């Protein structure tokens, strides 16, 4: 059983409005997003492209709905640009999240990333880091981890399709090369299964470094089409590769059990990017919240 005082349930705005494809959900407002999240029973959210960056305005809107900011995505370019560029942007990002009382900072290395390229096949063109790039990535993440620690925050690394840290082997390498007291892991079920990995293996191995969880389900039949037709990540999203927990092919019960048995503390955050014109965000948010209640008793 989860400790209900230590575990919070949130949902990402990506089901309402998509940062990589702004045309998806362009009609959905910030207020609609967070109102429907709260109506569905969620207590937190990550930051999307419609969210105000004025912390006073954002806090007020969230407080009215008894909501919090769990975290926000940060794109690092430690493998392709001078470290100082990433650090400058990171400090601004960190300070914004600190103002919003967030405890974790989601980081993904976007050097060589193809996740935002509409015509680039996700499996065939996946980037592979050189040894030098791995060293730059690890060294840079350790530095960013120290900057987060200054504010009593944690860097959580987001393994992601179409990036240099996608597979279990790549996650292993990153975890091995970084300081476990400075760099933690964001565990994303959907990205692991999409990549062909066993999510339970990664969960068991890094349970003590996992400080943020994205609950994302997969439609295996759609992934097969993506592979057959050599589609891109964005094309896969539009086709419906991802969905909310309980609507796809992942069994989340063992995931919840392992997290609970190991006294996981932090956010369980539903993140399922779909085309809102095809998958009504409110309907799917309610479906996800009911499923989590049934399977995790929280």
UniProtKB/Swiss-Prot annotation:
Pathway(s) served: Polyol metabolism; myo-inositol degradation into acetyl-CoA; acetyl-CoA from myo-inositol: step 2/7
Pfam families: AP_endonuc_2 (PF01261)
Listed Gene3D superfamilies: Divalent-metal-dependent TIM barrel enzymes (3.20.20.150)
Signal peptide as annotated in the record: none
GO molecular function: manganese ion binding; myo-inosose-2 dehydratase activity
Keyword Manganese annotated: yes
Species, as recorded: Clostridium tetani (strain Massachusetts / E88)
EC numbers on record: 4.2.1.44
GO biological process: inositol catabolic process
Catalyzed reaction equations: scyllo-inosose = 3D-3,5/4-trihydroxycyclohexane-1,2-dione + H2O
Matching HAMAP family: IolE (MF_01672)
Keyword Lyase: yes
Keywords of this entry: Cobalt, Lyase, Manganese
Source organism superkingdom: Bacteria
Name the record gives this protein: Inosose dehydratase
Family: Belongs to the IolE/MocC family.
Cofactor: glutathione; Co(2+); Mn(2+)
